[in-house]
């Protein structure tokens, strides 16, 4: 439980002006705040319309000041702890969302003894410390607030509702049961029958759990990638229209377009929502041999980012009979899929186009070739549809929502799986004490995952990303 004795308050809704503003108060003096501003404490969990006024104190506690103009008529709610979002006494004021109204209420709360402004994420941190949320749910809440696409929202919502945390709790209970078996064997060292009966079930549970976690970790980092977004690099020779393609995909002038070769020197990143999935489009420098050291650096960066991307769109000029094919470093085994975009199809009429005239798109597995025009938009609808489908398949591999969404989750689960493997490796030796210790380490790793143990060093990092009032 939280050992704080102070009470915090903050604006929890968006920055005014707005139709409605919500001010929250949490802590032992929340009742005093209600009495000071609203004159009374409403029935628990019932929205009550009350007139807020500026409080005063005569040394015997805060009181409603009837001699001054009221601040606002507000819906007031009272949530006695521990049946509240933070686990503490909590009050909520739903106000009209003007600057002056919000400022007056915050100023009035600041005069109530024992109240102070909240820091970033402090309401959520108190909920965590009071057992209302485990750490995976806290991270899910942070991701939900920061979600920019529908897929990110779904993943964050599942995490907030315990998709990983609940499973980790079930795993911990199974580990506790296995550990109890092993410790029973240690407590009765002379009972061979007892030892044989309990060690085997314990190790069988450990093996099963290790396999479950290992299967979970073999997910191609889908959860982390969904938080970060799919990376698509637009690459190719100079003057083939890469920047025009980026601008057409993003529906804005994100990149400079020029008839002069080598205009793009550095990598331009553009973020967009593609079919509900987060995507980062990279406009890279045209690849060619050059004596210009600045352009040469840009070409080097382009090669490196293309190799590290999830998909490469290699752009060629449809008006040329012989165009530069994708280089070997992009088509090697283990590299990203490479789609070929034959651009300037509007100018290729009557010339020797690269692609056959009887089809604009050829797709085979993860490979594709599109005949497009960045100028007219020809076949771009087909290209965008293909990219959206690729993103859907990329993030939906395995069917169910990803459980592991952060590197912290992955590290804790990897530590747990390794401890379980070490425990199982001691089966032949019969060293119950070592088996028990490895099972304890596995349980401790799961405890770190959900925030039960060894998390003080990560709490500040997690909560600093929250806004004030959350």
What kind of feature is each model-predicted range?
Residues 1-154, 158, 162, 334, ...:
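A glycine-rich (often HGG/GG-containing) alpha/beta subdomain
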Residues 2-15, 55-58, 150-273, 290-292, ...:
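C-terminal-of-GTPase-core extension/linker across diverse P-loop GTPases
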Residues 24, 246, 283:
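Short, acidic/hydrophobic/Gly-rich beta-strand patch recurrent on exposed beta strands
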Residues 51-59, 63-80, 262-290, 308-311, ...:
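Switch I (G2) and immediately adjacent beta-strands of P-loop GTPase domains
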Residues 108, 140, 305-308, 386:
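Alpha-helical scaffold elements adjacent to nucleotide-binding pockets in ATP/GTP-utilizing enzyme cores
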Residues 116, 278-280, 368:
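Conserved beta-strand segments of alpha/beta enzyme cores
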Residues 131, 239, 283:
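Conserved G/P- and acidic residue-centered "switch" motifs that form tight phosphate/ATP-binding loops
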Residues 295-319:
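Inter-motif core of Ras-like GTPase G domains
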């Amino acid at each position: 439980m939280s050992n704080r004795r102070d009470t915090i308050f903050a604006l929890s809704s968006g920055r005014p002006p707005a139709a409605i503003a919500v001010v929250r108060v949490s802590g032992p003096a929340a009742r005093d705040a209600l009495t000071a501003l609203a004159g009374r404490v409403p029935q628990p969990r019932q929205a009550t319309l009350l007139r807020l006024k500026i409080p005063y104190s005569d040394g015997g506690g805060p009181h409603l000041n009837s001699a001054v103009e009221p601040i606002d008529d507000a819906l007031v709610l009272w949530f006695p702890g521990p049946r509240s979002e933070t686990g503490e006494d909590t009050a909520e004021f739903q106000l009209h969302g003007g600057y002056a109204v919000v400022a007056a209420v915050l100023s009035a709360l600041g005069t109530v003894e024992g109240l102070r402004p909240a820091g970033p994420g402090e309401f959520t941190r108190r909920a965590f410390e009071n057992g209302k949320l485990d750490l995976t749910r806290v991270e899910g809440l942070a991701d939900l607030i920061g979600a920019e696409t529908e897929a990110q929202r779904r993943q964050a919502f599942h995490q907030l509702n315990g998709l990983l945390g609940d499973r980790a709790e079930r795993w911990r209970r199974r580990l506790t049961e296995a550990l109890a078996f092993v410790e029973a064997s240690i407590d009765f060292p002379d009972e061979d029958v007892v030892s044989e009966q309990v060690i085997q079930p314990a190790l069988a549970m450990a093996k099963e759990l290790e396999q479950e976690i290992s299967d979970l970790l073999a997910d191609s980092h889908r959860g982390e990638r969904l938080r970060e977004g799919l990376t698509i690099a637009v690459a190719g020779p100079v003057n083939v229209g890469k920047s025009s393609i980026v601008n057409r995909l993003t529906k804005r002038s994100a990149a400079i377009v020029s008839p002069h070769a080598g205009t793009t020197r550095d990598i331009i990143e553009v973020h967009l929502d593609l079919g509900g999935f987060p995507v980062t489009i990279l406009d890279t420098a045209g690849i060619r041999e050059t004596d210009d050291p600045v352009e040469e650096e840009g070409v080097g960066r382009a090669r490196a980012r293309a190799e590290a991307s999830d998909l490469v769109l290699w752009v060629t000029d449809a008006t040329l009979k012989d165009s530069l094919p994708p280089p070997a470093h992009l088509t090697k085994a283990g590299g990203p899929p490479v789609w070929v975009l034959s651009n300037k199809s509007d100018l290729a009429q009557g010339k020797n186009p690269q692609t056959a005239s009887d089809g604009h798109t050829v797709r085979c597995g993860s490979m594709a070739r599109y005949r497009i025009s960045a100028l007219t938009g020809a076949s771009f609808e087909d290209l965008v549809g293909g990219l959206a489908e690729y993103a859907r398949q990329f993030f939906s591999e395995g069917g169910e929502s990803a459980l592991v969404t952060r590197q912290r989750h992955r590290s804790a689960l990897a530590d747990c799986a390794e401890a379980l493997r070490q425990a199982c490796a001691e089966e032949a030796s019969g060293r119950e004490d070592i088996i028990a210790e490895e099972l304890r380490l596995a349980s401790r790793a799961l405890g770190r995952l959900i925030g039960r143990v060894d998390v003080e060093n990560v709490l500040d990092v997690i909560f600093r990303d929250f806004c004030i009032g959350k």
